[in-house]
Amino acid sequence: MAASTMAISSTAMAGTPIKVGSFGEGRITMRKTVGKPKVAASGSPWYGPDRVKYLGPFSGEPPSYLTGEFPGDYGWDTAGLSADPETFAKNRELEVIHSRWAMLGALGCVFPELLSRNGVKFGEAVWFKAGSQIFSEGGLDYLGNPSLIHAQSILAIWACQVVLMGAVEGYRIAGGPLGEVVDPLYPGGSFDPLGLADDPEAFAELKVKELKNGRLAMFSMFGFFVQAIVTGKGPLENLADHIADPVNNNAWAYATNFVPGN
């Protein structure tokens, strides 16, 4: 068995299915799904040692393990969360996935309220109140139209979400009948029907744009949560109130409501 082993370069063959010759009657198949990203264009301002830093020219020297190899690396890690390579890889995946969910969630929080304020009838357009409509006598009608999806069972909705989301996540990680997945973070193939990742340089820049917008969306969702708790209103209604009376409708004014004695 020792004579049959071979040295495999993870950088040269990352993401490539590898078959190693038979050992007796068995066969070993290995598929490395997470490897180093393709090197971006040398002139890109987002990668490499001369990339944009979190404080621009005042950033100082970044940690040695933040080399500008991955998208969204601004050389800032004061807590040392990326020092361990395995933890870094896990956190990268968590950030990308949470960014995508946050972008979808932020759109889902704002868009129904926007439609409602422009004449589209909803049972409840405010994002943190909409789900409770399923417990009402008439149930929950998507877009206020009973001919689309008329939901009356929270268990049925939960089951549908588990099946649909589980199937997509399973394919993203392990592949499926539509093709193999080389990188579970950027599976491509059926997940990229427009071929946006065909050009490596454009793809490298899109990764950065995705993370920048995703980080903004995560902060936005946090703001929506706080607004819902403090004001009991949706994001657009809060925005309209602030524009109408910025002196009395702002974060500082609401924060003083929680000061002892008020």
Swiss-Prot record:
Residues recorded as bearing N2-acetylarginine in the entry: R31
Entry binding sites for chlorophyll b 3: S153, E169
Family matches, as InterPro entries: Chloro_AB-bd_pln, Chloroa_b-bind
Positions where Phosphothreonine occurs in the chain: T33
Keywords: Acetylation, Chlorophyll, Chloroplast, Chromophore, Magnesium, Membrane, Metal-binding, Phosphoprotein, Photosynthesis, Photosystem I, Photosystem II, Plastid, Thylakoid, Transit peptide, Transmembrane, Transmembrane helix
Locations listed in the record: Plastid, Chloroplast thylakoid membrane
Annotated positions binding chlorophyll b 1: Y54
Superkingdom of source: Eukaryota
Binding site for chlorophyll b 4: Q161, R172
Binding-site list for chlorophyll a 5: K209, Q227
PANTHER family the record matches: CHLOROPHYLL A/B BINDING PROTEIN
Protein name per the record: Chlorophyll a-b binding protein 1, chloroplastic
Gene (name only): CAB1
